[in-house]
């Protein structure tokens, strides 16, 4: 170690990220965290999905990368809504030159949308900070029909709680090794109000909704942003209930200090590595 360095400063999450599996890569997560938040370039196949260093498009940011399980994929966008066309349409180009990958923190610029996305987490809550350009139609896509590795999203449910909160669940379809479908419950909070909650289903935009339920669809809250506006988003998960997801969020992340969570995550990683 050089003077002033800590073990956590030497961690390189990108090692073996060109040809690993969807559940190997770890960046914006805690040691043994239930949330394992990171970008996904590949979506299908046991060896062709998750964070793939040499692939050129980020499809979404998923909160679960586990053996036979994934889920709760999101992506911020600007301009024309392409959520109903799938991740191959709404995904974004990026450059490793504008990416920072560390233990407990991941930042990358989505070139198609000129959005800087920063990710960190607590054990059960993914924490996002998005820096937007000026746009009359900024959005955050929650795709409840996405595939990652062998784990596809069978269906989902979302309810608008307020103009800053939504809740729901994703039903992850069974796999060869996980013979039953699994519900992933979530609670999502924003630090700023969204103007409306919209939905998509079966390749079509449905317009504004208060609730969504079904297959092959999802939702996207929309915002108007000015240059440099920062939107913070918390995504808590539970395998028990929506109420438990809300409890996890309020217990683990009652504040909006993103930098403090990054620092706390790094300290926890350093403790494990020391």
Task: Give short role names for the model-derived ranges.
Residues 5-274:
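Accessory carbohydrate-recognition regions in carbohydrate-active enzymes
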